[in-house]
Amino acid sequence: MAVVYYDQDADLNVLKGKKIAVMGYGSQGHSQAQNLKDSGLDVVVGLRPESKSRAAAQAAGLEVKTVAEAAAEADIIQILLPDETQARVYREEIAPYLTGGKVLMFSHGFNIHFNQIVPPADVDVIMVAPKGPGHLVRRTYVEGQGVPALIAIYQDASGKAKEIGLAYAKGIGATRAGVIETTFKEETETDLFGEQAVLCGGTTALVKAGFETLVEAGYQPEIAYFECLHELKLIVDLMYEGGIKYMRYSISDTAEYGDVTRGPRLIDDHVKSTMKSILKEIQDGVFAREWILENQAGRPSFNAFRKKEREHLIEQVGDQLREMMSWLKK
């Protein structure tokens, strides 16, 4: 069973007198910085001089400096920038100021696990990764609750890395819900696999295949959209709330029978074998190398994929149908 830490396992005093630099002010950056500040900690946000987020961070009462300035004065540096920019920013603006005794932190292990960032041996390297989007991390904190998180120690130069990581997790509210111990390897590989095989890649491919099957069989695209995409949220919300068993309890018996008899025919051993090969590409670093090279080349394939996907009939139909849905934000 997983090792889980809670409020009583963490001490915010570990971070007293230390300056924490949060690099980036996106989904995780804004929530973690604000939560740390409201926990009474000394926080500075590191941003590009021209960043559009500077005004928002300042409006939240946060000190804002350039990444280099923030790195120079911080004891703890949390990098919350996009995966594809972290290595360059680290190399140019953080590494020169990452002196012995400092702490380097992440909320995703990609760049450490795949050696795009190689920290010096005399710094702690820690991951605290909330398992929810930034707005939820912030909202639950304000409500006196929290979002569960993962904690991993890659390097423990000080001998106190776990204490520091747990204190940070408490500062953002995560120990209120529970913090699960993991490793950089496990977090990175499972996160990428989930995105590719299930949550993003698997789901979108399944939805499009179902939509295309109905349209090619002569059914109206609008009806196919409702049955294969729009209603997916209803099912996912039920699973999110109570697991697969709760979803099956909530749907009709006809739907449940179709689920348990037809689902395994669709997602069969062949699909599982493909999943295993996708996982192996992640474990072996094949995907990481491919993505790194794609970015270095200016993203030609990625941009072409984006353009092609946006032109799919399902997007056109969806745009039209959502105009009928007054409850959706425009």
Curated annotation (Swiss-Prot):
Organism: Moorella thermoacetica (strain ATCC 39073 / JCM 9320)
EC number(s) stated in the UniProt entry for this protein: 1.1.1.86
Gene this protein is translated from: ilvC
Annotated family: Belongs to the ketol-acid reductoisomerase family.
Domain KARI N-terminal Rossmann: start-end pairs: 1-182
Protein name in UniProt: Ketol-acid reductoisomerase (NADP(+))
Origin organism lineage: Bacteria, Bacillati, Bacillota, Clostridia, Moorellales
Entry's Gene Ontology BP terms: isoleucine biosynthetic process; L-valine biosynthetic process
Cofactor annotation remark: Binds 2 magnesium ions per subunit.
A GO MF term: NADP binding
